[in-house]
C-alpha cells in the first residue's frame, strides 16, 4: 500500500469514442525509493483502446516506513483514478458506464498504452458477462447506488525449478522453490495428482531452499503458479514416462505399447498383450529391481505470460 495523489484527464467525442487520456501519479515510497509507479502508470489505461495516451509516475520519497508490495502493487491506485473519471465521462454522454467501457475496450490486436500489442485476451468477455448478469439488471432500492470498475495486471513468467519423486509406498513428494503465499501448494498438489491419476491426498508439496532445489525466481502472485505449474507438469510427465518404462520391463514389451491412465500402467490396446494393470503403488514396490528410485526434475525460464483483466459490479447503500 502506498499513499498517493492521482490526476487523470480523459476525453471522448459525441460518438462515445475515447480520443485521449493523460494520467499523472504521485506515489509515496517511504524512506527509500521504490514506489509502485509502474503498476499505477502501466495498468491504469491497459483495458482500453485509446489513440492518444500518456501516463507518468513520480516516486516520492518521504520520512516514513518503506512501502512494499501487497497485491498488484500500484495498479488499484491508478485504476481507481481512471475508472472514476470514466464514470463521469459516461454520465456526461448519458450512457451506461459498462456500455461505454465496452465500446472502448481493448481487443486482440489493440496496441496497449503500456507498449505491447495484445494477443487473444478476455477484457470484452468480462464486460459482456457483467452486462448479462442478473446483478446488472436488478432494481436498486432507496439510497442505493451501483458502481462499475475494471482492472488489469501484467503477470509474469521467469525461472522455476521442481522435483517430483515417488516414495516406496507409492506416494508422491513434489519439491519447488516457491514459498506459498496464496494456496500454490494446494494447486501444485492438485496438478500433480490429476496428471498421475491419483488422489490428491497422496501428494505432498515441499518448499525447497537453494541447497535442495534449483534456482527459482521471486514468488509473486502474478507468476508463481503459472511458472511452477509448467515446471511441475513437465517433471510429472517425465515421471509418468519412467513408470511406463518400468512397466515395460515387468511385462517385457515396448514402452510405446503402454499407456498411463487413472493411476495405472495399461497395455495400449489388444495388440500390446493381455496384462493386469500395474498401479502406482505396485510399480513403486518394484522400483529397485526395475531400475531404482523413481523421480524427475525440471527447470525452465517460463515465457508467454499474458495480462489479466477483471470487471466488478458493486452496490452500496447509505443509511
Region locations from a protein language model:
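Cofactor-centric catalytic regions
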Residues: 1-52, 60, 81-84, 91-93, ...
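The feature captures the short pre-catalytic strand/loop hairpin that immediately precedes
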Residues: 57-67
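A short glycine-threonine-serine/GTX helix/turn-capping micro-motif
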Residues: 66-78, 221
Amino acid at each position: 500500500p502506498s499513499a498517493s495523489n492521482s490526476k487523470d484527464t480523459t476525453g471522448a467525442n459525441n460518438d462515445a469514442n475515447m480520443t485521449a487520456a493523460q494520467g499523472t501519479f504521485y506515489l509515496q515510497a517511504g524512506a527509500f525509493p521504490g514506489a509502485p509507479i509502474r503498476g499505477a502508470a502501466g495498468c491504469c489505461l491497459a483495458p482500453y483502446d485509446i489513440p492518444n495516451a500518456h501516463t507518468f509516475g513520480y516516486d516520492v520519497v518521504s520520512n516514513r516506513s518503506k512501502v512494499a508490495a501487497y497485491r498488484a502493487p500500484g495498479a488499484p491506485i491508478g485504476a481507481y483514478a481512471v475508472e472514476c473519471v470514466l464514470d463521469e465521462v459516461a454520465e456526461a454522454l448519458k450512457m451506461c458506464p459498462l456500455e461505454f467501457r465496452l465500446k472502448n475496450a481493448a481487443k486482440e490486436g489493440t496496441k496497449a498504452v503500456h507498449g505491447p500489442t495484445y494477443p487473444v485476451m478476455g477484457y470484452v468477455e468480462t464486460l459482456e458477462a457483467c452486462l448479462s448478469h442478473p446483478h446488472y439488471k436488478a432494481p436498486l432500492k432507496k439510497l442505493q447506488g451501483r458502481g462499475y470498475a475494471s482492472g488489469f495486471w501484467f503477470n509474469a513468467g521467469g525461472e522455476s525449478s521442481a522435483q517430483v519423486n515417488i516414495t516406496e509406498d507409492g506416494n508422491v513428494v513434489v519439491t519447488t522453490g516457491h514459498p506459498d503465499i496464496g494456496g500454490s501448494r494446494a494447486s501444485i498438489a492438485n496438478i500433480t495428482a490429476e496428471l498421475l491419476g491419483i488422489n490428491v491426498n497422496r501428494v505432498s508439496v515441499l518448499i525447497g531452499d537453494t541447497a535442495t532445489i534449483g534456482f527459482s525466481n521471486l514468488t509473486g502472485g502474478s507468476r508463481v503458479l503459472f511458472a511452477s505449474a509448467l515446471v511441475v507438469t513437465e517433471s510429472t510427465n517425465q515421471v509418468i514416462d519412467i513408470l511406463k518404462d518400468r512397466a515395460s520391463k515387468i511385462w517385457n514389451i515396448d514402452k510405446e505399447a503402454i499407456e498411463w491412465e487413472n493411476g495405472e500402467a495399461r497395455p495400449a490396446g489388444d495388440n500390446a498383450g493381455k496384462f493386469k494393470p500395474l498401479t502406482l503403488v505396485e510399480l513403486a514396490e518394484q522400483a529397485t529391481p526395475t531400475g531404482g528410485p523413481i523421480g524427475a526434475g525440471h527447470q525452465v525460464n517460463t515465457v508467454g505470460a499474458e495480462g489479466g483483466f477483471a470487471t466488478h459490479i458493486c452496490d452500496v447503500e447509505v443509511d
